[in-house]
Amino acid sequence: VVKVQTVAVAIASTLASSIPALAQNSELAGVREEMKQLQRNYEERMQALEKRLTEAETRAAKAEKSAGQAEQSANKAEKSATQAEETAVAAGRRTGENAFNPAISLIMQGTWARTSQDPNNFFISGFMPSGGEVGPPKRSFGLGETELSISANIDPYFRGIVIASLSPENTVAVEEAYFQTLALAQGFTLKGGRFLSGIGYQNEIHQHAWDFQDAPLPYKAFLGGRYVQDGVQLRWVAPTPFFLEVGGELASGASFPGNDLNKNGAGSTALFAHVGGDIGESYAWRTGLSYLRTSANNRSFQDPNSLGIPVTNSFTGRAKVWVVDGVLKWAPNGNSTQQNVKLQAEYFRSEQDGTLTYDDLASAAPVFGGLTDSFSSRQSGWYAQAVYQFMPRWRMGYRYDALRYGSVNNAIVNNGLGPSAADFSLLGPYNPSRNTAMIDFSPSEFSRLRLQIAQDKSRMGATDNQVFIQYIHSLGPHGAHRF
């Protein structure tokens, strides 16, 4: 028993002494493993740092190279800027030298015409002749009106425009020659000289910019084709979100339905107002009301009597003209280059009150001599037209014109002074009308070719079937046309 106990004690002592040693060995192994892990992490971090350093050095080299290129580009840019500045200064000097030199442009026109009635015998039945150039162009090939325009700023306060008309008969006429203010405040503009009146819509548009070759019948009958003023005009454009314009004119009144009165003061007065705006992105409109008051003194015209002998008649008195105009334009989303439509119409009312003189003393066979009595007329007319650009550069259009004879009181006839209504053949009751169609092609904004056909019933009992081929060419700078 004692031996067994001794052996047990010895075994226990041995186990007790070996347990700490095992524990110490396990701890050392853990420490060694941690050190190895730290070493691996350190090596990985060093590798990462070395990689970042290499990348940074590479980027720095690239940046240095780019900086050199940028410096070279900057030097080139600076040199170019210096050259541009020198060029701009030189151009500025040239601009300053030419700032007040005029811009010159030329409009050339010509026609080929075929008519069933003689254009030399054109008149409008039922209405006093205006004496203006209202008839069709000459038959066959013919030169149209050539327009020479000169314009420039006079100084910071005024602009000057001169437009000369060169006729096919080799005569020169001043169509417009006026100054216009540039610096009046509050939306005012003053114009003085000879100018196209602001009444109506088409009156201010030059002939080469018309949508048809000739003027509508109401313009021919009541304004002699278009109304020109020698005087002054004041316009005011209101500061409103829509277009609102009011204007007035004082002038000599030498144009039909007036004539040269050879007196001091104004011979004619014109007032007009226009309002317009946009409807969405695709529509624009304008409408207006105009009034013209003028006087005539022995405004003469030739009228064949009942024997077909020309007799000189003359009117003295007052003339008034009212005009109502309207325009509607359509262009998809405001872009008119592909397609667009323009609707245009005007209504005219004319009143004349005064005296009419019938004088056949200068005729080959005088019958009644010189007779004078009262005369008055109330007449009207209108036209409507539509022009459609159906594809770029191509347009087609249609216009209808009509005049209404209304009421005419010729006291020479009514009071039985001798001449009968047949002795005033041009003033007999008649309602003229006309149908016109056209198609035109514009290779560019500087040229246009047009084919126009019309059935003109201006002359009583004589329908004039017309075919016109027209060319229009613009040379030099030309300003934008009116709305």
What are these regions (language model features)?
Residues V4-T6, E33, M46, F195, ...:
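Hydrophobic alpha-helical segments, especially transmembrane helices
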Residues A91-F256, K263-S282, L289-Y291, R378-S380, ...:
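Outer membrane beta-barrel
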Residues I11-S13, L22-I124, M128-G131, F243, ...:
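N-terminal periplasmic/intermembrane-space "pro-region" immediately following the signal or transit peptide
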Residues V246-G247, P257-N262, R299-Q302, T357:
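A short secondary-structure junction signal
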Residues E27, E50, E57, E64, ...:
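A broad helix-preferring feature
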Residues G135, Y178, N203, D211, ...:
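Outer-membrane beta-barrel pore domains
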Residues V2-L22:
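Gram-negative bacterial Sec-dependent N-terminal signal peptides
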Residues V31, V172-A173, W322, L343:
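Hydrophobic transmembrane-helix microenvironments that flank and shape a buried ionizable site
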